[in-house]
């Protein structure tokens, strides 16, 4: 028997959950990336440009001027336009990546599919930038694993020998939330 309050449709059938999902209206607002994330990325751009100018000046042997970073002010309409354009771009990129994965009889996309989709879309200039960001992200993950392993060693929780990366392979690793819940066992380690 269906939950209380469900009504039969015109054919006399109770709606199923998939039927209910089809009836929901999905708007563009539901699909947009969070405004805070988009604005944080937008505010990084002037800082990155300033760093690039300083690096280029240092390579040429020119004196490097250290100017304070300019504050970026983005209006509400501009932030909404950034949200919409970022969402459309990422969905378009994912569509191409899915097509490339489908051509190779795979159901999921991997990093190579995304990078090849950038070329396929006509944005080969973004490929090195995305690859560099991905490398930075993977390095940050490795650093986090190593820091976690060092904390386990200092806390006396490690029972195994470290692998070649200096980390430990545990099947039942504790989550970061569990580590945060036990502050009396943590030691501060500065990188």
UniProtKB/Swiss-Prot annotation:
Q: Which organism is it from?
A: Candida glabrata (strain ATCC 2001 / BCRC 20586 / JCM 3761 / NBRC 0622 / NRRL Y-65 / CBS 138)
Q: What is this protein called?
A: DNA polymerase epsilon subunit D
Q: What are the transmembrane regions?
A: none
Q: Where is the composition biased (Basic and acidic residues)?
A: 182-191
Q: Which UniProt keywords apply?
A: DNA replication, Nucleus
The protein's matches in SUPFAM superfamilies, at most eight in alphabetical order, are given as: Histone-fold
Subunit details for this protein? Heterotetramer. Consists of four subunits: POL2, DPB2, DPB3 and DPB4.
Q: Where in the cell is it found?
A: Nucleus
> Can you name a GO cellular component term?
CHRAC
Its gene name is DPB4
GO biological process terms, alphabetically, are:
error-prone translesion synthesis; heterochromatin formation; leading strand elongation; regulation of DNA double-strand break processing
Q: Does the keyword Nucleus apply?
A: yes
What superkingdom does the record give? Eukaryota
Q: Where is this region: Disordered?
A: 154-191
Main location, first listed in the record: nucleus
Note the coiled coil stretches, chain numbering.
none
What job does this protein perform? As accessory component of the DNA polymerase epsilon (DNA polymerase II) participates in chromosomal DNA replication.
Q: Misc remark for this entry? A: In eukaryotes there are five DNA polymerases: alpha, beta, gamma, delta, and epsilon which are responsible for different reactions of DNA synthesis.
* Gene Ontology molecular function terms on file: DNA polymerase processivity factor activity; double-stranded DNA binding; nucleosomal DNA binding; protein heterodimerization activity; single-stranded DNA 3'-5' DNA exonuclease activity; single-stranded DNA binding
- Biased-composition ranges for Acidic residues? 172-181
